[in-house]
Amino acid sequence: KRGEIFTNYFTPELDNGILAPTNTSLLNIFLTESTSDCRFTPFWIRPDNGKYSFRCFHKYEAPEESDPFFSYLVPMIRISEMFYIVAETTDDETEARTCLNLVRRNRGLVAFEDTEMVDIQQVLKEEYMKEFFGEGQLFFYYKRLNVSSIPAGDDSGMITMDEAKYKFPLPDSETDYRN
């Protein structure tokens, strides 16, 4: 099933229904077309088929030469996510900065200087947007923090959120046979 994600939703070969952010939305996430950020260049590719001028999401494209077993593994938690959790929950700004810098350096980005003023929560939000794109983790980050508005996938602005929008309805198969 996971192997169909790319071909059903993200491949540049689709005519209709392709899921892709606008160039402006993508640049709002990555702040620039950064060739140094390893989360940008391999996953966001501008197709050479002449069909689209925007970048398409290739994170779930099956590698041509790889063991299919490893292609479909999804980690329960990533080491980067653990560093983000520490950065978010610690009261020690130096520890938070150290955790963020460790991930940033390993993603090809410049570390924050010790004297640089950094809004840890804002940086965390930006890092979540880059690190977990297409995985659903960002939704749960927003839900956990009860964020009242989230960026729309297009250039239309923000989507207002409330408790009801953060809850998914239970499928009938989960409720049909309950007492």
Residue map of PLM features:
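Acidic/polar-rich alpha-helix caps and helix-coil junctions
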Residues: K1-A20, E33-N179
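Aromatic (Trp/Tyr/Phe) and Gly/Pro-enriched flexible surface segments
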Residues: S25-S34
